[in-house]
């Protein structure tokens, strides 16, 4: 979607409201909006629109275990809730998105599996941001 985002006038100067400016989702959303030419501002007073990240959580859970009760498969999930306001009105009511990816786990390959988990989480974040950007382009 690089450079292909059509944004409404209400979002030409956008403030991203979040409690966690270090989350993977916030950083990826910010980077993709900047790439698309959206001017991001540091205060709500300067903004023509606001994207509010109301909830931002990621973790993993066990999907299956072996006969010895050792995890053999995990699921990485990422959940965000966001809303979009612009021009004094709500453009997008709060929406919750959850994406998951699963992977097999081998205790003998711990380092490789940790890297795989990071890559899956990054892919999930990119997909979540793509969904939000697509929603913005339909406004």
Predicted feature residues:
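Short acidic low-complexity segments
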Residues: 38-49
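C-terminal/domain-edge helix-coil "capping" segments
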Residues: 108-139
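Surface-exposed short loop/turn segments
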Residues: 46, 52-96, 102-118
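Sec/Tat-exported extracytoplasmic proteins
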Residues: 33-40, 84-88, 107, 131-139
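A generic secondary-structure signal marking the coil-to-beta-strand transition
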Residues: 12, 49-50
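A structural "domain/chain start" motif
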Residues: 1-38
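Short alpha-helical linear motifs
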Residues: 30-35, 70, 118-122
């Amino acid at each position: 979607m690089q450079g292909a985002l059509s944004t409404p006038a209400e979002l030409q100067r956008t403030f991203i409201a979040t409690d966690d400016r270090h989350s993977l989702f916030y950083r990826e959303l910010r980077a993709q909006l900047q790439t698309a030419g959206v001017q991001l501002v540091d205060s709500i007073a300067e903004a023509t629109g606001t994207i509010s990240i109301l909830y931002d959580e990621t973790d993993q859970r066990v999907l299956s275990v072996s006969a010895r009760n050792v995890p053999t498969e995990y699921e990485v999930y990422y959940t965000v809730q966001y809303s979009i306001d612009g021009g004094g009105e709500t453009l997008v009511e709060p929406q919750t998105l959850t994406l998951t990816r699963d992977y097999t786990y081998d205790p003998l390959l711990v380092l490789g599996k940790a890297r795989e988990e990071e890559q899956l989480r990054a892919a999930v974040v990119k997909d979540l941001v793509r969904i939000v950007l697509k929603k913005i382009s339909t406004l």
